[in-house]
């Protein structure tokens, strides 16, 4: 029996691919033991606990790296690894994972890193030489590493089952009219107050122009967002604001166009589904990595880049009117699919098997 440990936390961009990969392995090797490490009382614990064994570390911040609390987290990580004795770890890099990586190096445990973004994060760049290899989502990412022999283009770990479903069927399952166009709006797993604020101003305009709208608000922002809007009236015309979209694959499958952040996992899903979008990168992302993610799509004609400091309701209307064209959407959809990597989980699964066989 192989004991595999996933390390992920922070945002859906790290946690969702980890969970997707774990599910893929579970289906193909049900005898393998699969566990997760993340932060206590966190987003990832809520998402994972009950499905897989979850081990929580005390929450630490990137600013704590030079503080005692970080070294205590390494001590806790060493204890957990000693108890679990994993054969291999899969790490989805962020500052949260550093104590586990350090503990793995100390205990000489093999680990893979997965880099979702075009621009590799600091954790990936710092520790990749100690790893079995880095699985990357974009071919452009290889250029940021000196030791390219450790870099493997697998693609992101995206569920593909629903992304190949019929668009009309997906709309129907989501509760929308299958004969009308559907706009998906998401500010990421946490939502975006800025995107929500500007979108709210143009909902009547969009509805009058035939759009149905599925809008992920974010759980923290939902109550304040819906206050004062004619929610029942707008709902009758096809507007559905929700705190969190539980089945994002279904939403992506049913959508004709999107307004979205430019997280790597979101982009991977959009590309596979052939979903063009207006990308509004999160402005506080390290090294502006969401801008680089979006540019990969924009340069092939698969969407539009709109910086948050340029975002306003008038600009959104201009861009949405530009993209409200069947021929333009069809060409963009095809461009997205051409650069997509649909078999990321299979590629990484084969890589794990190869490394494990080479160990024996």
From Swiss-Prot:
Disulfide bridge map: none
Compartments (UniProt record): Cell inner membrane
General function of this protein: Cell wall formation. Catalyzes the transfer of a GlcNAc subunit on undecaprenyl-pyrophosphoryl-MurNAc-pentapeptide (lipid intermediate I) to form undecaprenyl-pyrophosphoryl-MurNAc-(pentapeptide)GlcNAc (lipid intermediate II).
One GO CC term, this protein: plasma membrane
UniProt GO MF annotations: glycosyltransferase activity; UDP-N-acetyl-D-glucosamine:N-acetylmuramoyl-L-alanyl-D-glutamyl-meso-2,6-diaminopimelyl-D-alanyl-D-alanine-diphosphoundecaprenol 4-beta-N-acetylglucosaminlytransferase activity; undecaprenyldiphospho-muramoylpentapeptide beta-N-acetylglucosaminyltransferase activity
InterPro entries xref list: GlcNAc_MurG, Glyco_trans_28_C, GlycoTrans_28_N
Protein known as: UDP-N-acetylglucosamine--N-acetylmuramyl-(pentapeptide) pyrophosphoryl-undecaprenol N-acetylglucosamine transferase
Entry-linked Gene3D superfamilies: Glycogen Phosphorylase B
Statement: the UniProt record of this protein carries the keyword Cell membrane: yes
Pathway(s) annotated for this protein in UniProt: Cell wall biogenesis; peptidoglycan biosynthesis
E.C. no: 2.4.1.227
Catalytic class of the enzyme: transferase
Residues annotated for UDP-N-acetyl-alpha-D-glucosamine binding in this entry: 11-13, 117, 159, 189, 245, 290
Key words of the record: Cell cycle, Cell division, Cell inner membrane, Cell membrane, Cell shape, Cell wall biogenesis/degradation, Glycosyltransferase, Membrane, Peptidoglycan synthesis, Transferase
Broad class of the protein's primary localization: membrane
Single GO BP term: carbohydrate metabolic process
Catalyzed chemical reaction(s): di-trans,octa-cis-undecaprenyl diphospho-N-acetyl-alpha-D-muramoyl-L-alanyl-D-glutamyl-meso-2,6-diaminopimeloyl-D-alanyl-D-alanine + UDP-N-acetyl-alpha-D-glucosamine = di-trans,octa-cis-undecaprenyl diphospho-[N-acetyl-alpha-D-glucosaminyl-(1->4)]-N-acetyl-alpha-D-muramoyl-L-alanyl-D-glutamyl-meso-2,6-diaminopimeloyl-D-alanyl-D-alanine + UDP + H(+)
PANTHER family: GLYCOSYLTRANSFERASE (PTHR21015:SF22), UDP-N-ACETYLGLUCOSAMINE--N-ACETYLMURAMYL-(PENTAPEPTIDE) PYROPHOSPHORYL-UNDECAPRENOL N-ACETYLGLUCOSAMINE TRANSFERASE 1 (PTHR21015)
Membrane topology category: Peripheral membrane protein
Family per similarity comment: Belongs to the glycosyltransferase 28 family. MurG subfamily.
Gene name in the database record: murG
Pfam families assigned: Glyco_tran_28_C, Glyco_transf_28
